[in-house]
Amino acid sequence: QFEKFVKWFLKTDPTWASQIDEVWLWNEYPKRWGADCGIDLVFTHKNGKTWAVQSKCISPNNDIKKSEIDSFLSESSDSKIDGRLLIASTDGIGKNAQQVINRQEKQVVCFLLEQFRQSEIEFPSSMEDLNQGKRKEKKKPRPHQIEAIEKVSEGIKTADRGQVLMACGTGKTLTSLWIK
């Protein structure tokens, strides 16, 4: 089930969807070379490169163990694979697993629970509702933030840096993202 969710996520999340041409579960992948031995999904990047994906659905309280990624690292080292993505429902990667990931010649990109939380998607409540998942509504600056943005924009025309002083909880970080 998690593999189907990951496929949906890669096709729906604005960051990933903008980089990906096509996503397949391993058993759908037209160029697969055997049974599922560690690669759960494959996608083609817009640059034409092929990526292998390992999806790990484990408790957020647990770490990914080396033994849980060994077959993925082995299978995805094939010359047909250009990139590797480890996507998991936890933020924890065990010490030995992290050491093996760090020593790989072919980079392994890790996308973990915290990145899911930061996604711009409203997640569906069940697997049956995947088709109804949608992007979160973009935040818009509030009146006090608009005022701060205008004042900072004016100030940096004559100075190379500045400072924003706003009360706690008024959205300083978000305001800073709107300053151009």
Regions found by a protein language model. Give the residues of each.
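Nuclease catalytic cores
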Residues: 1-7
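Acidic active-site catalytic centers that drive phospho-/nucleotidyl reactions
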Residues: 40, 54, 145, 172
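Helical mechanochemical/support elements of P-loop NTPase systems and associated helical scaffolds
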Residues: 2, 65-68
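Active-site beta-strand-loop-beta-strand hairpin of nuclease catalytic cores
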Residues: 42-53, 79
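Glycine-rich, highly charged phosphate/nucleotide-binding loops
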Residues: 36-37, 68-70
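ATP-dependent helicase/translocase motor core
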Residues: 9, 15-18, 24, 31-32, ...
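Short beta-strand-loop-alpha-helix junction that forms the active-site gateway
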Residues: 47, 55-66
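Active-site metal-binding core of divalent-cation-utilizing nuclease and nuclease-like domains
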Residues: 21-47
